[in-house]
Amino acid sequence: MKITKRIAFDAAHRLLGYDGPCARLHGHRYILEVTLEGTRLDELGMLEDFKSVSSKLKEGPFASWDHRTLLSKEDPLVSFVEEAYLMDKNPTAENMLLEFVEKWGYGFNTAFTRLHSVKLFETPDCSAELIL
């Protein structure tokens, strides 16, 4: 069985070395989906309490990424931007998913559930997904 929780956040980013408009600073209304899987329900009939999943998302990526500028540590804008979240790599949707799993993914695994996948929408019709 699987359950999925979504959370939305707003952030700006740009891509160093990209030949196109995404090289300029711009923003997105991101949607992050986290899917957990397991085989056992608790005594209330839940795989995992959605409230618990939501709290983990709010304390992790939402607190770090919402209303921030996501930049590569190599970006010359770093010294000019307040409230920046710095990444080792370009802040692509794919790299953001890898960052999510590395920093917060372990917190979603319990005795009876595990993190199955994370999906990040940059726009309503463009997303990246990491299946674990």
Task: Label every model-predicted segment.
Residues 1-132:
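Charge-rich, low-complexity N-terminal segments
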